[in-house]
Amino acid sequence: DWSSDVCSSDLTSETIMISLYPTIYHTFQCKADRCENTCCQLWTIDIDEATAERYHTMTGPLGESLRQAITVDDEGSHFVFSKEQPMCPLLNENGLCKVVLELGEEGLCDTCHMHPRFYKYIEDLELCGVGLSCEASVELLAEDTQSDQVIFTIEDDDGEFSPDERLTIQNIFELLAFDIDSSYFQYSPNPDVQYYAKLLDLYGTTEPIDEEWTTQINILSHDTGKLITAVQSYIANHDMGLFNKVFQYILYRQIDMLADYSLESILSYARDGVEYILITSVIEGSPLKQVARWSQQIEYDEDNVELLLQHYDSLQ
């Protein structure tokens, strides 16, 4: 498969691990109670077995609160939030986690401790990052207005690479033995009626995160001609640097999917993603919120990612 093809002597040996990090990874910090769109809501959090055992046997008021918050089924222990109770019951009145306040971050389950960090692997290459569903991640990505490129650091076990070395997304593909023209890594908006109609139809087939997602798709599909005019005006009056970085970051997160899907499919996935973010930014405003919203709907639903990539593969 593709994974074994790219792992040449330049990349790996029996003992070497190479880790890549977007620079925002190193400065990321949870906003906690300052977050307007907390991750402590509206989804199911799987609790690892070791932490679940500790929670179930913990004494005192915190232990009681934890047991009341946990749902147990055949697949294990979970924190389950619903429309009726969207927020984690372990948040105090100030929006701070009771577990962290009493036990520190090491008291969290693996999912809560790691989120929104992600790690993907291609043989001995480790792709690290922080997910765009988190507003703190998106804000960090947007902070550097002097560049429209995502910059990465590289670390390896044997010191072959300098800690001061900086890479672009193109350099990463070169590490993987892909010789691709730099133009493929630059996002170019494509306000076109037929393209937008197909994009909205396709996104309408994804499993919605909530009713608002479906409503938004329907509204955007109502008059694509007017939508094109609005997008063209936005492009003429706004810098596209953030959208280019988002495009590269979306692409980076799915590099490991090249084991199962074509490069063209991965590029289409990233292009469509950032085009949809552009569209919603034009209509709804708040581009940073639109990035996080898209990520929650698409990136954090593996079924939706697979659905889209299978669609793009079927077109070739």
Model-derived segments and their meaning:
Residues 1-8:
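Short, small-residue-biased leader/transition segments that mark boundaries at the very start
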Residues 9-64:
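General N-terminal leader/first-domain-start detector
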